[in-house]
From Swiss-Prot:
It comes from Naja atra. This is Cytotoxin 2. Belongs to the three-finger toxin family. Short-chain subfamily. Type IA cytotoxin sub-subfamily. It is found in: Secreted; Target cell membrane. Disulfide bonds join C24-C42, C35-C59, C63-C74, C75-C80. The lineage of its organism: Eukaryota, Metazoa, Chordata, Craniata, Vertebrata.
Length: 81
């Protein structure tokens, strides 16, 4: 009985992600990556001249400020970029 209980506890720990990890889209949204510790935001970078096509996506720790040439959109849920 103790062995069964221990097995269930181990399976639960393995199945549950005890340390939450954020998943962000790569440039092609069909693919994503798991962000490393400390990178708690997903971002999407656009050139101001063409705001419909993102040029870069990924994980980041702090959302960069927009500039005259580049716009950033940041979010904090899985695959939100």
């Amino acid at each position: 009985m103790k062995t069964l209980l221990l097995t269930l506890v181990v399976v639960t720990i393995v199945c549950l992600d005890l340390g939450y990890t954020l998943k962000c889209n790569k440039l092609v949204p069909l693919f994503y990556k798991t962000c490393p510790a400390g990178k708690n935001l997903c971002y999407k970078m656009f050139m101001v001249s063409n705001l419909t096509v993102p040029v870069k996506r990924g994980c980041i720790d702090v959302c960069p400020k927009n500039s005259a040439l580049v716009k950033y959109v940041c979010c904090n849920t899985d695959r939100c970029n």
